[in-house]
Amino acid sequence: MELQEVLHMNGGEGDTSYAKNSSYNLFLIRVKPVLEQCIQELLRANLPNINKCFKVGDLGCASGPNTFSTVRDIVQSIDKVGQEKKNELERPTIQIFLNDLFQNDFNSVFKLLPSFYRNLEKENGRKIGSCLIGAMPGSFYSRLFPEESMHFLHSCYCLHWLSQVPSGLVTELGISANKGCIYSSKASGPPIKKAYLDQFTKDFTTFLRIHSEELISRGRMLLTFICKEDEFDHPNSMDLLEMSINDLVIEGHLEEEKLDSFNVPIYAPSTEEVKRIVEEEGSFEILYLETFYAPYDAGFSIDDDYQGRSHSPVSCDEHARAAHVASVVRSIYEPILASHFGEAILPDLSHRIAKNAAKVLRSGKGFYDSVIISLAKKPEKADM
């Protein structure tokens, strides 16, 4: 089976679907002010045709309610500028393209569109024809839009996914060079870490080059993804998954060879690696870069404070929180896990993930490192 056929979130609307388990993104409120600033600066710059039709691409939109949370924030940011100008006629038509791989559950996405349009008219006074939303399926590591056609490109929690498993993870004798590991983790040797970094460098460079061609001069990109600000200071979702698969091997429920042949195309870069690649590729200026922490169990309760490390790591809801974390992890990785190990293993694996998540939450290290980076396409010399 081709890798792209399983590199998607779990579809549908069941208990293990991404739609039911993606609410944690709603609590990453650090992104919204930067998003608003990007869009408002774009509109005030009076770039070509932007006040007639503002064109947006959401790269790696996945499925579920949070797809439209981002869209709503974009629309509200655009309309906020119109309100400041006190001229409703200056509100541009908005055209938004939702992008993900062909296997993404776009059916679930567009089932939510009628209610989104109703809420948009109620909250923003926008008729359906003033905000046009469509799909643009395909890999965001390839061309998606015509040259110099887009004003703003956005991607949230996608760019840590690589286009392929790095080469060099198997020796000439066919033995795994990353035994006991499923990605570039703490136990991986330097050659493995270099292989993953090399693949990320290649992919991120391609991403920047291709999408710089699609953006108009001085167009913007806002990217948020997993990083490793503190080297292995606290385990991320991949570490939870790796620990849990190893538990199944130790307990005799899974063959060691199955684990050793499982390599996930994910890499969490450092901010220095991100900055270096952007500067070396050369198409963009870095306007803003910030790292922050998102807790494992964000989305478990709307009453929690998820702005940082402020909440207590121990809770009377510990087991429920850990089960929530396991459901989120399963909703993200189930297609690739089922493809390699088979579906029968998933319930036992989820149980181990919950047990390991409880331990990490109890230790106070249940956080993901994330980076937000705002980029502006450098103008051509003739435009300066």
Curated annotation (Swiss-Prot):
Residues that coordinate or bind theobromine: Y157, H160, W161, S237, Y368
The enzyme's E.C. designation: 2.1.1.160
Catalyzed reactions: 7-methylxanthine + S-adenosyl-L-methionine = theobromine + S-adenosyl-L-homocysteine + H(+); theobromine + S-adenosyl-L-methionine = caffeine + S-adenosyl-L-homocysteine + H(+); 1,7-dimethylxanthine + S-adenosyl-L-methionine = caffeine + S-adenosyl-L-homocysteine + H(+)
Keyword rRNA-binding part of the UniProt annotation: no
Feature type site, description Involved in substrate discrimination: H154, I266, V328, E343
Residues bound to S-adenosyl-L-homocysteine: Y18, C61, N66, D100, L101, S139, F140, C156, C158
Pathway(s) of this molecule: Alkaloid biosynthesis
A Pfam family per the record: Methyltransf_7
Tissue expression as described in the entry: Highly expressed in developing endosperm. Detected in young leaves and flower buds. Present in immature fruits (grains), but barely in mature fruits.
Keywords noted in UniProt: Alkaloid metabolism, Magnesium, Metal-binding, Methyltransferase, S-adenosyl-L-methionine, Transferase
Cofactor note: Binds 1 Mg(2+) ion per subunit.
Any Gene Ontology biological process: alkaloid metabolic process
Gene Ontology MF terms in the entry: caffeine synthase activity; metal ion binding
Names of the cofactor(s): Mg(2+)
Record-listed Mg(2+) binding positions: N178, D260, F262, N263
Parts of the chain that traverse the membrane: none
Record has Glycoprotein as a keyword: no
Protein family according to the UniProt entry: Belongs to the methyltransferase superfamily. Type-7 methyltransferase family.
Function: Involved in the biosynthesis of caffeine. Catalyzes the conversion of 7-methylxanthine (7mX) to theobromine and of theobromine to caffeine. Has 1-N-methylation activity.
Official protein name in the record: 3,7-dimethylxanthine N-methyltransferase 2
Organism of origin: Coffea arabica
Encoding gene (name): DXMT2
